[in-house]
From Swiss-Prot:
Its cofactor is Ni cation. Its EC number is 3.5.1.5. This is Urease subunit alpha 2. It is found in: Cytoplasm. The keyword Lipoprotein does not apply.
């Protein structure tokens, strides 16, 4: 029996060698392998093979899987791009490969039982949930935007409309963690690292449950504060995120690198418009112990980027535009040359992480789509890297998932689709990839996704909107999510966190750098000409013209 390849793909998903377009980004992926055996496929539904006596094993759930996602195309920095089934047990990825009943099929990796729930993944794409390491939690509604974009892990600062830039108070952290029990996202908080004494930093870690520090110029990014934060971080194995001294009052970029003295740091919005040494903080992008990241307002570089950032800077930094000094400080941070070079550095793998900077000059729900819009822009400018865009797509998915997890010590739990990790998975229709997820699974449980008219006869009746699923209600959000804390909080055992979440210690944050990131390990001498603004990498000029329009935008959003 033969079947038309398009008809086969419509029923069973694409085969090895088939190609998929990712939204309107211009990116095309090729399926590298297929775990299915043609002619003996696993498929759920009326008259299909996922039945007792056929491809479902009559066994207790504890001997099979709780949930299986069948025949989905995985895009993952670790797994590559391939069609597999994903077995989930007790909230974690249990098996990856061919699904079915080993009593009736050969080569089964994912045992599906008569008690297993099935998510039909045929025709869909699965990615690991995105990890956003730069979120100003000024509003609880940020979580709606984050979940609706495919973010399942947040490293945050603040606990509402307060001037925080890090949270140190055990009292405040107690209530902030408690508030998150209503949301199916993993959460970690950064303590404020801008202190010349270590006492409030240690207090934040051991008593409050913070998972790292934020050193910010608005609160002090001088020599003593930066060194203090790094010393405490080295002792407790947590990450330090840096928003460096944009006024160069105490330190230039060269001075900051000397203070680091080879110690690992995560340099936020490394392009500089979001803050940092003027005009050349981008020099830190090529340094072996500096993990650089971008925030999404400058991604990809577009025609309106320069104009829109002035008002954003004034607002979030409480500047007064009638004061000449304040206006000049804002304008000095906006440089078209570094914005254009930022896209190119991402494409070369010299910047390994993207994040939102939500409500601190970024948009919580746009990191995923802006990252892939940037990838599409770079393909349009520099051309495809081969017969398909697999390498480029994997490089960019790593910026959203495994690399931020590695930087903040979360990669033993999240960031990739691997056996043993939390089953934080996002399912996408290919035509909506990067823009709007179809379903967000938190620890394998439906948490957010497309929902239809609740009074309709089927769940696909319009209007279709993104909204909370059962994993976002009742006691479930806390039970399927974790709180990332410092090991000191677990060792001391005296934190006052009321959360029912499992506490997980961050680890492996020190002594790492770009070389430890996935698919984004380029280092080199990045220089910014202070007169012309031209950016070079190892002497080669980096330029990118502002885009007139970007993908994953107006086609999907009003």
């Amino acid at each position: 029996m033969t079947i038309d390849p398009y008809a086969y793909a419509a029923a069973h998903g694409p085969r090895a060698g088939d190609r998929l377009r990712l939204g309107d980004s211009g990116l095309v992926i090729r399926v590298e392998s297929d775990a299915q055996h043609y002619g003996d496929e696993f498929l759920a539904g009326f008259g299909k093979t996922a039945r007792d006596g056929l491809h479902l094993k009559a066994a207790a759930v504890r001997d099979t899987c709780d949930v299986v996602i069948s025949n989905v195309v995985v895009i993952d920095a670790v797994q590559g791009i391939r069609k597999v089934s994903i077995g989930i047990r007790e909230g974690r990825v249990h098996a990856i490969g061919r699904a079915g009943n080993p009593d009736t099929l050969d080569g089964v990796d994912v045992v599906v039982g008569t008690g297993t729930s099935i998510v039909s993944g045929e025709g869909l794409i699965a990615t690991a949930g995105a990890v956003d390491t730069h979120v100003h939690l000024l509003s609880p509604r940020i979580m709606e935007a984050s979940l609706a974009s495919g973010v399942t892990t947040i490293i945050g600062q603040e606990f509402g409309p307060v001037w925080g830039v890090g949270v140190n108070s055990p009292w405040a952290l107690k209530h902030a963690f408690g508030a998150f029990d209503a949301w199916p996202v993993n959460i970690g908080f950064l303590g404020r690292g801008s202190s010349s004494h270590e006492a409030p930093l240690i207090e934040a870690l051991a008593e409050g449950g913070a998972s790292g520090f934020k050193v910010h110029e608005d609160m002090g990014a001088h020599t003593r504060a930066l060194d203090t934060a790094l010393r405490v971080a080295e002792e407790h194995d947590v990450q330090v995120a840096l928003h460096s001294d944009g006024l160069n009052e105490c330190l230039s970029v060269e001075d900051t690198l000397r203070v680091l003295d080879g110690r690992t740091i995560h340099a936020f919005h490394i392009e500089g418009c979001g803050g940092g040494h003027v005009p050349n903080v981008l020099k830190m992008a090529g340094v072996p112990h500096v993990i650089g990241s971008s925030t999404n307002p400058t991604l990809p570089f577009g025609r309106d980027a320069v104009a829109e950032h002035y008002g954003m800077i004034v607002s979030v930094h409480d500047l007064k535009t009638d004061l000449p000094g304040d206006a000049a400080m804002a304008r000095d941070r906006i440089r078209a040359g570094t914005m254009g070079a930022e896209d190119v550095l991402h494409d070369l793998g010299a910047i390994g992480i993207t994040s939102s900077d939500a409500q601190g000059m970024g948009r919580a729900g746009e990191t995923v789509r802006r990252t892939f819009a940037m990838a599409g822009k770079m393909k349009a400018q520099f051309g495809a890297e081969g017969d398909d865009d697999n390498a480029r797509v994997l490089r960019y998915i790593a910026k959203l998932t495994i690399n931020p997890a590695l930087a903040h010590g979360l990669a033993h739990e999240v960031g990739s689709i691997e056996v043993g990790k939390l089953a934080d998975l996002v399912l996408w229709r290919p035509d909506h990839f990067g823009a709007k997820p179809q379903l967000v699974l938190k620890s394998g449980f439906p948490a957010y996704g497309v929902v239809g008219d609740p009074n309709a006869a089927t769940d696909t009746c319009e209007p279709l909107v993104l909204g909370p699923q059962f994993g976002a209600h009742g006691a479930t959000p806390a039970e399927i999510s974790v709180a990332f804390v410092a090991q000191a909080a677990l060792d001391q055992g005296g934190d006052t966190m009321p959360t029912r979440r499992r506490r997980v210690a961050v680890r492996g944050t020190r002594g790492i750098g770009p070389a430890d990131l996935r698919l984004n390990s380029r280092t080199g001498a990045v220089d910014v000409d202070q007169r012309t603004g031209l950016v070079t990498l190892d002497g080669d000029p980096l330029r990118s013209e502002p885009a007139e329009s970007v993908s994953l935008n107006r086609l999907y959003f009003l």
